[in-house]
Amino acid sequence: MEVTHMLKITKFGGSSVANAEQFKKIKNIIQQDPTRRYIVVSAPGKRFAADNKITDLLYLLDAHRKYHVDASSVFKLIKNRFIEIKNELGLKQPIEKELDAFYTNLNQMSQAVIVSRGEYFCAKLMAEYLGYAFVDAKDIIRFKLDKSIDWDATSAKLQAKYAQYDHFVFPGFYGTSANGHIQVFPRGGGDITGAILAKCLHADVYENWTDVSGFLMADPTIVKNPKGITHITYS
């Protein structure tokens, strides 16, 4: 058997973790390549056109909290989504209790904590499903007071986890501020998280997966059979 020391950081977006079937596809992708050892995930996205992204529901949950509106129906949608994934995959971790504790303590949480929980819970389920360690972004990604990345601190913490674990799953989208509080990137920031891991761990390749192969000239949910873009420049 050929031994390779190549290191890949592999990021899966929201549509790629939308349900249990998508989790199964990810496991197959990971098993096809032993260099895919460090995985970054987004929060579950839409399963179908009229569906809700978990992060959108979390922002709605925060708005209900802010304006003192009953949020139980919104929370139920969020909770059921994660429980459905857990049950369909036969996972064992008591995520129901952690979800309930999250809702119970909602009024004590900042918006950043609330909206980052989609990635957090998704990464915990993915870690169990793959048999990988779960590494929480809040313990690793560090921001400076000006909200830029503290590269020295972040790199040191990532290198320590790299030395500790051969494989781990990492939630995208958030880290910890200079004041010790959860801080999030702009929407779509899970891609930034993946790039940070790739830079700090000196990865050979950074893969960013979606549920659509390649680059298309139009949104396939709007335009039927759009043509692909075979060559594209970074600039």
Describe these PLM feature segments.
Residues E2-S235:
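Nucleotide/pyrophosphate-binding catalytic subdomain
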